[in-house]
A protein has these predicted regions:
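Short carbohydrate-recognition loop motifs
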Residues: 348-364
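Secretory/extracellular carbohydrate-interaction modules
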Residues: 363-420
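Carbohydrate-binding surfaces in secreted/extracellular proteins
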Residues: 385, 449-474
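Blade-edge beta-strand/turn elements of extracellular beta-propeller
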Residues: 2-8, 49-64, 100-118, 158-182, ...
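Short, aromatic/His-centered strand-loop micro-motif at the edge of beta-sheets
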Residues: 429-448
Length: 485
């Protein structure tokens, strides 16, 4: 018996997709315009996870130049077939839908095989039928004309894995459960007991988000929806419920025939979901040929008992992240913006340190500014970074930041100066700077920049080399215009 604590992946881990190979489970998530892209996770009990790499970890795989932070890589699907792992996903501004492959989920993963204009839409998925054929399951705008925002449909076409192209124009199979529903997306196809099951998200990633399902005896026929659709949603629980926006699920079974679903949801704080969409887990039972998610409960729970033996991992994902720069490569958990300039940092110039060279690009621009970031996993947290920064020019800056996008972030930075350095706290909101606090710094050498957050409020501190806490710099509200990251 193992106990999964929800969310099983805390913080910015949206659009989960999962597959099982023997006793091992592998899961991936969207990464948008961050580099590297598509984190890959491994588990043996669905409760404890470790990150084993990033599928898109080379610049040749991941063109993101100029992308908004919420664009980039959307909704990957991971599948396994005859010794090969497949991930299909969308780079919304650079090439569209593509497939990458690997013999080991740790990588290396191949360069993208772009599927071209024929594979339109977003959130593609792959399905391997019993005869070995591979099918592309996608979304696209209503070909008869889009009547309203989100008027899309789900379609299927066979995929030639050797040529990496679709074999035909595709067959529309469903438009979602509700009449005139918006954004039928995130499709996943399964086969069970002679039926093909198509599970999708609909309602948009917001208060109306949900999971719906349909089935058919043939892939080329219209799918009939479950009469209980949507089969899962939190839309009826109200905006103040601790977990909202539940949807976009992917099913998986265990070796004993038990079923589960992973999905995204968000935990709001003071009306904002500023840590993004997270990955949750629920149990599934089949009744009358249809899946029932968390039967007898009907909503996501804080803990889920699983009929799988507990299996602990050496590098389990936890709520506490500690990064020591004593390795030869950057930690898989660290993210950069759009790309990572290998000449702009070093782990060997000073042993035990990450040396970050100054760049002209700014965090206020949609560029690859100098940035290494960790996902925020909770609303109550502390974060600190030890830093040496002895620049003398006034336009040279370094520090820490709570980053949501180029237009909205909160930073504490050391600014260079000919005589004395300054420490500033700046709120950059809707592309405008507000100086919240400014202090002169007399201390030299190593400084520890320290942030303590509680809910949507944060207090900043600075410690010198002797551990002395300098004057608190600012106490401020963290709530910025919310985007669903």
């Amino acid at each position: 018996m193992s106990i999964a604590k929800n969310p099983v992946l805390s913080g910015f881990y949206p659009d989960p997709s999962i597959c099982r190979v023997g006793e091992d489970y592998y899961m991936v998530n969207s990464s948008f315009a961050y580099f590297p892209g598509i984190p890959v996770f491994h588990s043996r009990d669905l409760a404890h996870w470790e990150q084993i790499g990033n599928a898109l970890d080379r610049e040749e795989q991941l063109p993101l130049s100029g992308s908004e932070i919420s664009r980039g890589i959307f909704a990957p699907t991971i599948r396994y077939h005859e010794g090969t792992y497949y991930i299909i996903t969308t780079n919304v501004d650079h090439g569209g839908n593509f497939v990458i492959t690997a013999q080991d989920p740790k990588g290396p993963w191949s360069v993208p095989h772009y599927l071209g204009d024929a594979a339109e839409g977003i959130d593609p998925s792959l399905f391997f039928d019993e005869d070995g054929k591979c099918y592309y399951v996608g979304t696209r705008p209503n070909p008869s004309g889009v009547r309203h925002n989100g008027d899309w449909e789900i379609w299927i076409e066979e995929l030639d894995l050797h040529a990496m192209c679709l074999k035909g124009a595709g067959t529309a199979v469903w438009k979602g459960a509700l009449k005139d529903c918006i954004w039928p997306e995130g499709p996943h196809l399964y086969k069970k007991d002679g039926w093909y099951y198509l599970m999708i998200a609909e309602g948009g990633t917001g208060p109306e988000h949900s999971i719906s399902i349909a089935r058919s005896r043939s892939l080329r026929e219209w799918f009939c929806g479950c009469k209980r659709n949507p089969i899962f949603t939190h839309r009826n629980l109200g905006r103040d419920y601790p977990v909202i926006y539940a949807g976009h699920g992917d099913l998986v079974d265990d070796a004993d025939g038990n079923w589960y679903v992973v999905m995204l949801a968000s935990r709001p704080c003071e009306g904002h979901c500023s840590i993004g969409r997270e990955t949750f887990l629920a149990k599934v039972e089949w009744e009358d040929g249809w899946p029932v998610i968390n039967p007898g409960i009907g909503h996501l729970t804080e803990k889920t008992e699983l009929p799988i033996g507990e299996y602990r991992l050496e590098r389990e994902v936890t709520h506490a992240d500690f990064i020591a720069f004593d390795q030869k490569k950057i930690d898989d958990r660290l993210l950069s913006l759009q790309r990572r300039d290998e000449n702009a940092y070093s782990l060997i110039e000073r042993k035990g340190f990450l040396r970050m060279h100054l760049k002209k690009q700014k965090l206020t621009e949609k560029t690859d500014a100098q940035y290494f970031g960790l996902r925020q996993k909770d609303y109550d947290f502390t974060f600190s970074a030890c830093m040496e920064f002895d620049a003398e020019r006034e336009n040279e800056q370094a520090g820490i930041v709570c980053y949501q996008n180029h237009a909205n972030h909160l930073s504490m930075r050391i600014c260079g100066g000919k005589e004395k350095r300054k420490l500033q706290v700046i709120a950059h909101i809707t592309e405008n700077d507000t100086l919240l606090a400014e202090e002169e710094i007399n201390a030299k050498g190593m400084l520890e920049l320290y942030l303590k957050a509680a809910g949507q409020r944060a207090e900043f501190f600075v410690r010198d080399e002797e551990g002395k806490v300098l004057k608190p710099v600012s106490y401020t509200h963290l709530t910025l215009p919310t985007i669903l990251r």
